[in-house]
Amino acid sequence: MLYDSYEKEHSKRGFLELMEKGTVVAPCVYDCVSAKMVEQAGFPAMCLSGGELAASLVGVPDIGLVTLDELVGVVERISSCTSIPMIVDIDTGFGNELNLIRTCKRIAQAGAKAVHLEDQTFPKRCGHLQGKTVIGHDEYISKIRAAKYALEGSGCALIARTDAYHVISKEEAISRCNDAIDAGADITFIEGNATIEDIIDCGKRVKGPKMFAMLSSGASPKVTAEQVSGWGYRLVTMHYAMFAALAAMEEFGKKCFESGSDIPITDDPKVDGRPIYLFEKFGIHEWLRLGNSFGGNIKDADELEKRE
């Protein structure tokens, strides 16, 4: 589907609807290319990662340095070129309850089908880093109520994330999640469950739909979506796109630097380095046909023939 398709945007299914049919796996993305590749891999949903966005868009670590305007712009661009629903990490909501209301409305209007709001103090940091602090229990629930108010009627679900597991205790994390559900959250998310026993226990004791963030290279144990589904989690995120891209860029960057050529790329059977390969992922032929449908005379974009 082409850019800014209203029909496409309205036809995107919500997360609660998807979760009724089974556990939804939503890999993390950070730009239009990663989002398109997740969609074309066959996943039913995606999650815009705050940490990966900070690195790719601004070139900074995940310590609360991305602005709301920067985030909204990326949400708009990804929404315009994909057809699967997206969760958006809104960190701490960019302020108090009033700031949060504006944040939620702007992100929902930009095309998000879910947001996840955390209870860290500002400036926040990646949930898998030490040195986190969280706001008070009552303040967090107040922000959940404000976010729910802002999202009412938008079709955008509210995911209540807590970092209290590592900062305070598992019991406090469970309590915050249950109170968040009572305050209107649609889904809950305990960041960084460190053991399988705790993942199972939280799955049993937290009310309502639950999300699990799969990051086995971080604080969480190695598990599969099938496993956590059996433990009561209906939404699972994973971080493969950026880490795979980083590894490939490091590998081929070294080879190309040492050879002084792009031959390591062009001769690798796993890599299609043709420009048309990239552009076809984003609908170049459909774009050109669209231009001609209005009476234009735009030539199609076939590849140049290679001369030996």
Please place each PLM-identified region on the residue numbering.
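Alpha/beta enzyme core
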Residues: 2-214, 218-237, 244, 251-254, ...
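Shared catalytic-loop signature of beta/alpha-barrel
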Residues: 231-276
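Flexible C-terminal active-site loop/helix
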Residues: 259-308
